[in-house]
């Protein structure tokens, strides 16, 4: 395929990479145009790797950004050696479809900690290795990065899509993602160093706090507002934080808006001018799933329409920079989340759900 040939040439052009083709035989052709009226504002957080037809449909429907799980443990599976091949393929595909990556960087390799959810802040060598990895990632994929320079040699017509924002970790107020227990002070240190590293390479990039759900259901969890306040208590955080991530999962629209409002109020209270970014929001569409986030398909569509519409109406007031829906397609990935398997905008057969129609009504995109 054309993409496979391009990735093969990138293996030669970008030092230190071994790049396979990314699995599709489709000729990517010209860059897809993002449909609708909002460019990269609306995004998707997929729970599986979408195929090219998915990406084309997303883009036509007004999805202009894509939440990328940038896993340190995947890239540095062997201590001291980076394998970027999976992400070279992913960033290339997104650029071919005109979509902006929004990476959240997470996952400590087993060479440094026994669990990927144990942060690298406990050990100076691990913390240095994190900084080295993050620097390498931004040098590769950031503005004027090595990857985009190599792509331009092979395909000068392809428009680069470097991340506008880098999100540091995921839900660190939950012990699911921050073992053994959430620690706002340690997260502040992780964030501050990460911000310094990223801006040292790409001064125009935004560095965003991890999206947090206000009240995680895990042992030792910390309310996201309390957690964020303790992070801001550290010297230099207002300069380090460019945007604040929010995961306002809630059973109804009022609770969604309440979480966003409380986060915005805290940012204003501490005197920061950081924007907000909803990096995950969603509901399931199987009411038998046993969760207050499990609705009917019609209710899922209505909640999407009302919550995203209300947030859009208050975009300037809230300093809202983006909204990312979880997720694209109904698929059971085996995670311990009863409603997640039906959180898609399309069903398992990729047929439109009421939520996809509501989404494209909002964006002005094409649902087909």
Q: What label would you give each PLM region?
A:
Residues 18-21:
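C-terminal motif of bacterial Sec signal peptides marking the signal peptidase cleavage site
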Residues 29-71:
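Boundary/entry segment of secreted carbohydrate-active catalytic domains
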Residues 1-6:
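N-terminal export leaders
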Residues 23-25:
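Bacterial signal peptide processing site
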Residues 40-46, 66-68, 101-105, 164-168, ...:
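Hydrophobic faces of well-ordered beta-strands that scaffold small-molecule active sites
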Residues 58-221, 236-237:
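Substrate-binding cleft and catalytic face of glycoside hydrolase catalytic domains
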Residues 162-167, 172, 288-303, 313-368:
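Aromatic-rich peripheral "rim/lid" segments of glycoside hydrolase catalytic domains that contact
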């Amino acid at each position: 395929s054309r993409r496979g040939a391009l990735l093969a040439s990138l293996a030669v052009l970008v030092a230190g990479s071994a790049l396979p083709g990314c699995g599709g035989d489709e000729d990517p052709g010209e860059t897809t145009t993002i449909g609708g009226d909002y460019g990269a504002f609306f995004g998707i957080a997929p729970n599986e790797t979408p195929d090219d037809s998915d990406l084309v449909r997303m883009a036509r429907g007004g999805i202009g950004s894509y939440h990328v799980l940038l896993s340190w443990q995947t890239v540095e599976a062997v201590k001291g050696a980076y394998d970027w091949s999976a992400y070279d393929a992913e960033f290339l595909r997104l650029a071919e479809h005109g979509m902006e990556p929004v990476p959240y960087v997470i996952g400590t390799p087993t060479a440094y900690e026994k669990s990927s959810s144990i942060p690298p802040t406990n050990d100076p060598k691990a913390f240095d290795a994190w900084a080295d990895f993050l620097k390498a990632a931004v040098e590769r994929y950031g503005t004027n990065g090595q990857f985009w320079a190599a792509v331009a040699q092979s395909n000068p017509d392809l428009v680069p899509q470097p991340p506008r924002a880098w999100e540091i970790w995921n839900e660190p107020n939950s012990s699911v993602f921050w073992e053994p227990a959430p620690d706002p002070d340690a997260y502040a240190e992780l964030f501050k160093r990460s911000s310094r590293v990223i801006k040292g390479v790409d001064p125009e990039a935004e560095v965003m706090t991890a999206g947090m759900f206000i009240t995680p259901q895990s042992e030792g969890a910390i309310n996201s507002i309390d957690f964020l306040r303790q992070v801001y208590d550290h010297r230099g955080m207002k300069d380090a934080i460019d945007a604040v991530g929010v995961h306002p999962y809630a059973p109804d629209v009022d609770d969604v808006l309440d979480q966003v409002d409380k986060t915005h109020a805290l940012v204003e209270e501490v005197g920061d001018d950081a924007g907000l970014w909803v990096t995950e929001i969603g509901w399931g569409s199987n009411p038998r799933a046993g969760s207050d986030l499990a609705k009917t398909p019609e209710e899922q569509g209505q909640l999407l329409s009302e919550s995203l519409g209300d947030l859009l109406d208050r975009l300037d007031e809230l300093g809202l920079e983006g909204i990312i829906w979880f997720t694209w397609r109904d698929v059971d990935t085996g995670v311990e989340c009863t409603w997640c398997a039906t959180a898609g905008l399309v069903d398992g057969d990729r047929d439109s759900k009421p939520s996809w129609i509501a989404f494209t009504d909002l964006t002005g995109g094409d649902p087909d």
